[in-house]
Amino acid sequence: MLPRFILILSALPIAAAMAARWWFGMRVLAENGGRPCKCDLARWVPEDGEAVQKAEESAHEFGRQLRLKALAEWQETDPKAAKSRASSKRFGTAVPPISGIVAVMAVMVAKIPVMGAIAAILAATALSAVVGILSLTPELAAINRAARKLREARSFPRRDDEEAVIRCAMAHAWKETLPPILALIHR
């Protein structure tokens, strides 16, 4: 009875996280990611002389670059919060596989039933998904700060391109918030 309750209780946050990833990440990238955008490289490339980039790319690629710039700036301005977000991502990467290994070994030595092992794996995955979603807010705030700077710099001649790039940057953050085991399932 308890494993079934845990299965149901774990399925809800997993389904909610997958739905949020699709709605705020995958759907937005599908709608806006293919848009060809043109930027002014003198305003787009940061002062530290990053690798040379193309002036014409898709909104998907510019969004990815904007997110990476935002994360780098965030690392400099608030390293404690950035490390916390990175730790939550590592938690989501490590906990489901480790719980799977422990559950399989527990089944092999006949300490828990198979249904209990499946429930434990799903519970660990649900916990990882919840931690990933809850720790996403500071990253989105960092992307918002970078987007504000992007708007002030007027890196994109067309406002529509700029908005598509910002939406794609936010979508990349949502896309990468799930634990990798769920990201493999939810392509």
Model-found features: residue ranges?
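Polar-ligand-bearing catalytic/cofactor-coordination segments
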Residues: L2-V95, I133-R187
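Hydrophobic alpha-helical transmembrane segments
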Residues: M1-A11, V109-A124
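Alpha-helical transmembrane segments and their immediate juxtamembrane interface regions
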Residues: V114-N144
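Alpha-helical transmembrane segments and their immediate juxtamembrane boundary regions
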Residues: K89-K111, A119-A129
